[in-house]
């Protein structure tokens, strides 16, 4: 089994269509162990019980947005080093800079294509093994 097939990825987005698009793109790239959450609160609960190796999260969500989730992930010791990628429809430089200060690994602007996602994840996956 390849490394990609073994890695557990958590996709967090409040829009069902977006979750499915990201999941399909990940499957196209060879990832097989993909979980989904509808918001940051649900994602954090999932990470506390069954941590993933990588998180791909939408920026703008109700209850807990992407940066709030990133902060929660970084301050919870068992998940503090989990790679984190933000998806955003409107990349605000100040928000992205805040994300980098919190330990954001990368970001993608929506809409994206699978090749952009592949490039964004290659370096992260390389560091995981």
State where each predicted segment sits.
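Acidic, metal-coordinating helix/loop segments flanking the phosphotransfer/catalytic sites
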Residues: 36-54
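Conserved acidic segment of CheY-like receiver
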Residues: 6-17, 22-26, 55
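Alpha4 helix (beta4-alpha4-beta5 surface) of REC/receiver domains from two-component response regulators
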Residues: 23-24, 68, 91-106
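Receiver (REC) domain active-site loop signature in two-component systems and cognate sites
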Residues: 61
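Acidic catalytic/metal-coordinating carboxylates
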Residues: 39-42, 65-71
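Active-site residues of response regulator receiver
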Residues: 58, 88
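C-terminal output helix
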Residues: 112-122
């Amino acid at each position: 089994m390849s490394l990609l097939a073994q890695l557990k990825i958590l996709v967090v987005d409040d829009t069902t269509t977006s979750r499915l698009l990201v999941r399909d793109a990940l499957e196209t790239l060879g990832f097989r162990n993909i979980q989904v959450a509808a918001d940051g609160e649900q994602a954090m609960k999932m990470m506390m019980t069954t941590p993933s190796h990588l998180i791909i999260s939408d920026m703008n969500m109700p209850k807990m947005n992407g940066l709030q989730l990133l902060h929660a992930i970084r301050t919870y010791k068992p998940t503090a080093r989990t790679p984190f990628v933000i998806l955003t429809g409107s990349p605000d430089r100040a928000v992205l800079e805040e994300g980098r200060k919190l330990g954001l690994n990368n970001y993608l602007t929506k809409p994206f294509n699978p090749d952009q996602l592949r490039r964004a994840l290659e370096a992260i996956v390389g560091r995981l093994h």
